[in-house]
């Protein structure tokens, strides 16, 4: 669905970082491969997302809006 605006655990604003995270991951996927855990960690470090709770919010988010829209 839609990414939560704030981290559920610490309250840090994460919605603004989600788009940049997805853009960087898609750049890696455009090369024909999945990002490695080290690359994901570097993306988070570059974005300034240090807490594991915030990282969890972004990594575990599943965007289902495109799958749900045909049923509305």
Curated annotation (Swiss-Prot):
One of its GO terms (biological process) is DNA-templated transcription. PROSITE patterns: RNA_POL_N_8KD. Zn(2+) binds at residues 7, 10, 53-54. It catalyses: RNA(n) + a ribonucleoside 5'-triphosphate = RNA(n+1) + diphosphate. Coiled coil: none annotated. It holds the Pfam family RNA_pol_N. It is found in: Cytoplasm. It is an enzyme of class 2 (transferase). GO terms for molecular function: DNA binding; DNA-directed RNA polymerase activity; zinc ion binding. InterPro entries: RNA_pol_su_RPB10 (IPR023580), RNA_pol_suN_Zn-BS (IPR020789), RPABC5/Rpb10 (IPR000268). Its cofactor is Zn(2+). One of its GO terms (cellular component) is cytoplasm. Binds 1 zinc ion. Signal peptide: none annotated. Its EC number is 2.7.7.6. Keywords: Cytoplasm, DNA-directed RNA polymerase, Metal-binding, Nucleotidyltransferase, Transcription, Transferase, Zinc. DNA-dependent RNA polymerase (RNAP) catalyzes the transcription of DNA into RNA using the four ribonucleoside triphosphates as substrates. Belongs to the archaeal Rpo10/eukaryotic RPB10 RNA polymerase subunit family. Part of the RNA polymerase complex. This is DNA-directed RNA polymerase subunit Rpo10. It comes from Thermoplasma acidophilum (strain ATCC 25905 / DSM 1728 / JCM 9062 / NBRC 15155 / AMRC-C165). The lineage of its organism: Archaea, Methanobacteriati, Thermoplasmatota, Thermoplasmata, Thermoplasmatales. The gene is rpo10.
